[in-house]
Amino acid sequence: MLLPSLDSAAGRAKNARLESDLATIDNAILLYKMDNGTCPSTLSDLVDEYIAKGKKFEDATGTELVYTLSGDKLTYTLKGRNADGEQVTSDGSSDAEE
């Protein structure tokens, strides 16, 4: 019965990393917006100055996060999936997960 326990621990670790990554990206977008007046067009626009080079924008399943920018470039949503395959959404607000 050790294997299910390890799977559960691995899933929790992936979910914790996803939560941390979303918070980091939210903060980077906020800093970008403060410097430029709008949100970045793509997450790649954050690399080097706001996010370390080589950062992968992936969710807990290894799939690329989906970044959607509003028409006025002032708001965004960032979506991915947790280790259980449930959608997690961040929009930079204090209640980032739905």
Residue ranges and their predicted role:
Residues 27-84, 97-98:
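Extracellular/periplasmic head regions of type IV pilus-like filament subunits
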Residues 18, 22-29:
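N-terminal membrane-insertion helices
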Residues 1-20:
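Amphipathic alpha-helical segments typified by the pilin-like N-terminal helix
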Residues 10-13, 80, 93:
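Short, intrinsically disordered, low-complexity terminal segments
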Residues 87-92:
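Edge beta-strands of extracellular beta-sandwich domains
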